[in-house]
Amino acid sequence: MMAKQVPSVSVSYARNGNSTTSNELGMRAMQERAYEKRGEQYLLIKSPPASGKSRALMFIALDKLHNQGLRQAIVVVPEKSIGASFNDEPLSDFGFWADWSVLPKWNLCNSPGTDGGKVKSVTAFLESGDRVLVCTH
């Protein structure tokens, strides 16, 4: 049985300022390359810290929710502090066709509580009609 390869986007920078320039949708070069792969079921994004991985995921998740038929998106981050990167973001102010929005009750990185309570919250989210949940793994 052959192992299935997971598409990935790796980025290295020449330090010439191009990585901070945005396109007409408000995406930097790495985010644009990741967005080009948005139809993949699995996507691994390897990029330096503060390069825009969180925002790239917002672009991709919004496309999956609005254009690819996904009902809900669960963003899973390795630590609570990274979850703050997924608060509401007015992406349309920069040219994208939608804004990123997470109801406060569904950003479990910002809410106190035990893991048992968070498991109940995930279950409640899955049973709800809401679109996005952010939590730690």
Language model features by range: what are they?
Residues 3-46:
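Conserved pre-motif I regulatory segment
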Residues 40-60:
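Walker A/P-loop
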Residues 42, 71-72, 102-107:
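Residues that mark the start of a beta-strand
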Residues 42-44, 72-74, 130-132:
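Residue-level preference for the first positions of well-ordered beta-strands
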Residues 54-58, 64-65, 69-95, 136-137:
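Conserved Walker A/P-loop ATP-binding site and its immediately adjacent core
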Residues 81-116:
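Conserved helix-turn-beta segment of the N-terminal RecA-like "Helicase ATP-binding" lobe
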Residues 120-121:
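Conserved helicase ATPase core of P-loop NTP-dependent helicases/translocases
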Residues 126-137:
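Conserved two-lobed SF2 helicase motor
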